């Protein structure tokens, strides 16, 4: 639809099909540009669309207005696995109602203030903000753990290389 909106959105293989504003809220209807998805089990591409159910998820605000994205949740059939799978999206975690960047934003805001304050500003319940915070904390802890173990492995490899290399 609008190249500028697509560029601002910064989601790969996605275009903004329509934009509507209602009661200090913005609604962007998205459409995927790719006709196929990668199977989560066998990693092969499938273009056999089984069903498409649009969902509404919250994203970062645009110009101080609450923003929602209406995205198609596509389910494909994989001939190799003989099963159905829901397309994974780079901009949101499976089963979540918010974009990753919005959840990361909320996590950062809670670190700077409190769950209560963020709850009031974002007009979300305390429990929602707390759940998002815990989810992001767990992701970051897991990521930090993986980075720490990878770093330790690299250091270990460097020590071995130093011991075995001729001097």
Regions found by a protein language model. Give the residues of each.
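Short, basic interhelical loop/turn and adjoining N-cap
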Residues: 116-132
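Short, conserved DNA-binding cores of transcription-related domains
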Residues: 1-83, 88-89
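Short flexible coil/turn linkers enriched for glycine and charged/polar residues
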Residues: 22, 112, 159-162
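Residue-level signal for the short linker/turn that defines the boundary of a DNA-recognition helix
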Residues: 37, 113-114
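Short, Lys/Arg-enriched anionic-surface-contact patches
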Residues: 82-102
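Short, amphipathic alpha-helical "recognition" segments used to contact nucleic acids or chromatin
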Residues: 98-113
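RNase H-like nuclease fold core
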Residues: 133-167
């Amino acid at each position: 639809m609008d190249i500028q909106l697509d560029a601002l959105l910064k989601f790969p293989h996605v275009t903004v099909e329509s934009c509507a504003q209602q009661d200090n809220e913005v609604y962007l209807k998205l459409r995927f540009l790719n006709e196929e998805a990668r199977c989560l089990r066998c990693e092969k591409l499938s273009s056999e669309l089984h069903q498409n159910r649009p969902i509404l998820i919250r994203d970062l605000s645009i110009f101080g207005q609450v923003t929602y994205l209406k995205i198609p949740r596509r389910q494909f059939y994989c001939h190799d696995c003989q099963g159905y799978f829901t397309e994974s999206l780079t901009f949101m975690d499976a089963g979540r109602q918010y974009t990753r960047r919005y959840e990361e934003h909320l996590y950062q805001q809670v670190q700077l203030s409190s769950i209560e304050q963020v709850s009031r500003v974002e007009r979300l319940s305390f429990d929602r903000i707390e759940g998002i915070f815990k989810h992001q904390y767990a992701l970051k802890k897991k990521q930090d753990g993986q980075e720490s173990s990878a770093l330790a492995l690299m250091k270990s490899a460097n020590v071995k290389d130093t011991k075995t290399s001729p001097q």
